[in-house]
Amino acid sequence: MRRKGTKPSTACHQEEGPPPSQDGAHSDEEMEQPAGEAESAAPAKPPGEELDNRSLEEILNSIPPPPPPAMASEAGAPRLMITHIVNQNFKSYAGEKVLGPFHKRFSCIIGPNGSGKSNVIDSMLFVFGYRAQKIRSKKLSVLIHNSDEHKDIQSCTVEVHFQKIIDKEGDDYEVLPNSNFYVSRTAYRDSTSVYHISGKKKTFKDVGNLLRSHGIDLDHNRFLILQGEVEQIAMMKPKGQTEHDEGMLEYLEDIIGCGRLNEPIKVLCRRVEILNEHRGEKLNRVKMVEKEKDALEGEKNIAIEFLTLENEMFKKKNHICQYYIYDLQNRIAEITTQKEKIHEDTKEITEKSNVLSNEMKAKNSAVKDVEKKLNKVTKFIEQNKEKFTQLDLEDVQVREKLKHATSKAKKLEKQLQKDKEKVEELKSVPAKSKTVINETTTRNNSLEKEREKEEKKLKEVMDSLKQETQGLQKEKEIQEKELMGFNKSVNEARSKMEVAQSELDIYLSRHNTAVSQLSKAKEALITASETLKERKAAIKDINTKLPQTQQELKEKEKELQKLTQEEINLKSLVHDLFQKVEEAKSSLAMNRSRGKVLDAIIQEKKSGRIPGIYGRLGDLGAIDEKYDIAISSCCHALDYIVVDSIDTAQECVNFLKKHNIGIATFIGLDKMTVWAKKMSKIQTPENTPRLFDLVKVKNEEIRQAFYFALRDTLVANNLDQATRVAYQRDRRWRVVTLQGQIIEQSGTMSGGGSKVMRGRMGSSVIDEISVEEVNKMESQLERHSKQAMQIQEQKVQHEEAVVKLRHSERDMRNTLEKFAASIQGLSEQEEYLCVQIKELEANVLTTAPDRKQQKLLEENVSVFKKEYDAVAEKAGKVEAEIKRLHNTIIDINNRKLKAQQNKLDTINKQLDECASAITKAQVAIKTADRNLKKAQDSVCRTEKEIKDTEKEINDLKTELKNIEDKAEEVINNTKTAETSLPEIQKEHRNLLQELKVIQENEHALQKDALSIKLKLEQIDGHISEHNSKIKYWQKEISKIKLHPVEDNPVETVAVLSQEELEAIKNPESITNEIALLEAQCREMKPNLGAIAEYKKKEDLYLQRVAELDKITSERDNFRQAYEDLRKQRLNEFMAGFYVITNKLKENYQMLTLGGDAELELVDSLDPFSEGIMFSVRPPKKSWKKIFNLSGGEKTLSSLALVFALHHYKPTPLYFMDEIDAALDFKNVSIVAFYIYEQTKNAQFIIISLRNNMFEISDRLIGIYKTYNSTKSVAVNPKQIASKGLC
């Protein structure tokens, strides 16, 4: 059953609307209105209701370029194809059904009526965004499958799968990598729908953009022909009847792409109409102002006549006043002649006197300024030196004090440490001594017991040897008993002697300390005295050597200054010579490379055989490197040779011919004078520089030759600027760019490219120079360079000597100042030590021991020592005897008795040490308290002295830092001032010398000037009288002001020449003429305001004319742009139209086997006025309009047009629903064969019930319906036929 459809050209079927909601869904009512219908619903605005105020450039720039073809028509180009369609619960398809796969070229869908064939097309329309009504449904929810077996389904989905392929032979093809994608649309029960691209949620706009980018024509729906619509394509009206209606003209315009120009053409047309209206208004204003201006012209002329008369009268007054002044000046001249005779001989003296006076004033002022400056700097240096000397003295004093205080602090620290250790030691003496006594007593008792044991052991040993040593042993025992008595006496005597000695040492300790301090003080006094003596001698030596060093330093500095100046002069000379040598070498190199013709001509010039030769034109001038390429590209005459005249040029030509050297072109300067007037500056577009003005020459005569070569060629930065500048309305210019591109006055363009010309003209003018001259310059450069090196070496030696002398001088000064400052400190130290020695000597006397007490203690020590010595001597004798006996016994007993005896000796020795330790401990306990009190007093005194000394050290360090900072500042200031002092002193001496010379000259001139003064005073009185009269007449002339007349510039009061003044013989006649003119002026009564009013109207008239010209120019620009766009639209349309109509004719002839069809213009002069008519001549019939054809003929005509449009603008996909319904068997076969054979770069999916259509297809998609659900099956007819299955 066929469906009623609408023609695809009247509306677009895709969705457009507001953005989707958050869930991405669209409602059927809100979102599925076609864009074309939305446009038709909006009322058209009248052209004058809203004016487009964009500039012409903005309007033209807003025009998009012609749309590119969506896909290529040539073989092997990538194209889009549908692989298969997946329907899920869509219309008659229950569940998920896959339709396909479709063939890459020709697929037919077949099946019985009502099986769901057209639902295949509907599924694609659904995905492509068509409204529900276009898919034969009232709303989207109706598209969801509903049958007895499948109820309450909530949604339906259709997926169309695409891929891009490259065709190969036969049915084979290559799939482009990553080109597969699918577009799906899902509709819900609430009539909303969502789109997905390859599973990702998208808007319909994204889907539309994607499909358009792959060549699917969603805008004109050429890919889709539904039931009954095939003939409606050809039946469109020639042109749309309304603005939003679409006929054949609009249909073709959209396909060709020139429709994009319609809106800009309308805008420009409206702007031209409005500008014409405005221009009419401006023209009327000009005429009105011109009429008012003409009405004021009579009064204006009368006023001008009056002003002219007054000007004539003022001129006459000017003449008579000048005559009177001239007469007085002649009288003054006579007197002046007398005056000149008087002081003619003294004129030079007066001038010299004035000059000397001015010089004297200037020099006196300069001397005062320099003296002030010099005094200020000198005073500043002296003040700083005094400050530094004082600071250095303070520094030495503080350092000496700091040194003494630091030394004192170190000694006190050591003393304090010793005193503290002594206090701690004395504090622990009683306890330690008691502990020692207890421990020693215990140890002594233990040793006594041990000795008894060892003696018993020894006795046992000796008993064993008794028989052998019995006699000796008895004798030894007797001696030992005697020794035991002696040992007790010895220990007691030794203890008494050591106690007495300790008491004597403690009693004499303070006195011994005082004696030690006195000895050290005397040694320090000797050291200070020797240092003072050495420094006084050093000061005397420095005072002798310092002046000699200073004198030597001055001489070296003078020599260094002289060498420095010589070095500067020589370096400057060497630098200049180096530049000259480099320029000479460059010039020589360029001269060598200029060619044999130019070399021969230049050689003739140098030899003098052909005078008047200047040289190659390019070598006679220079230009900035920026313009090198420009002038090298556009000026062919740079290689011409410049000569003074045509005769010289002829001589050069004859010379070249005679010697067969070559040919050359010459410029004769005597023929170039015709260009002199045109060489002046000119006004150029955009102030573009003229190349001629950029050329620099040494000889101004050559400029005419350069103008001849360049004329008014301009140089632009780039080709865009060059194009703007070259094509001016009133004149065309010759322009060259910095890249060498040239635009001639004729409009032709040349130059540019990858290789450009450069180097034909240098950045400096080249002089002729020989190899000998270059060698001479190089020799001179080498000589001066060696001399500069020698002076530099001498300078370095002098600089080193000056540095050494300055160091030596500075060291002497510092040493002198330090020694001078330290002498006082050493003297004070010497005095201090003397006082200290006296104090220490008094202290020695104070601490001197009592002689009686000392003698008593010494006598005690002596008595105890004698007692000890006497007892010890006796004990020693007994002990020696015991030892002898013991040794004898030992010798007898050999080694048996020796070990035991050694043990016993060791114990005896330890017992002696214990006795001595107990004695010392007892003495220490007795003297500990007294010594502790003295030691604690000493610690307190030392700590107080340390605090005072530390405070003194910190104060001295702070003072020393302040002194150093001040000294550094003073030194820096002094150095800065001393650096500027020599220059100021030199300037002062020079000024004084110059001033002395001027004073001597001035005194000589004053004597001569005095005698002349008296004579001149008499003459000056007469001249003054005449001058006062001249001033009066000059004042009268200054009052004379001429009136400006019309637009002429105001005339200045003429100054008569001497000849004109002498020609005035009768001044009274001029006076009479002035009186006559005054009478005429009094009779006239003009309106002088008429001139200003006329001028005002004239300015307004010119302003109105300028406005008229401006709007006329703007109107012309818009009108020209309007005409250009109309022409462009026509050209684009006709180019596409001829391609389409020719292909239409070819297709129709093929489809009908002899018929003819064409698209013809209703109005051959203007295709856009009446539109396009589709005319057809079926085979063996006459030409007919499309409306008069049969159904089959209309179908064939429409298909021919569809295929012609495909040829012009290919579309990858075509869907056709029973396009062969109205065709007979023969025509169906022709159409099917045409689709199969001719259209190989597109995919056709056709629904057909005609066997001669679907039998020829590459793939059949069978549609059948069972159990209220549509199914499909795909087969390849050719494969089935090849297997013999049909």
UniProtKB/Swiss-Prot annotation:
This is Structural maintenance of chromosomes protein 4. Residues 611-725 form the SMC hinge domain. Residues 1-51 are annotated as: Disordered. The keyword Glycoprotein does not apply. Belongs to the SMC family. SMC4 subfamily. It is found in: Nucleus; Cytoplasm; Chromosome. The gene is Smc4. GO terms for molecular function: ATP binding; ATP hydrolysis activity; chromatin binding; single-stranded DNA binding. ATP binds at G111, P112, N113, G114, S115, G116, K117, S118. The lineage of its organism: Eukaryota, Metazoa, Chordata, Craniata, Vertebrata. The keyword Acetylation applies.
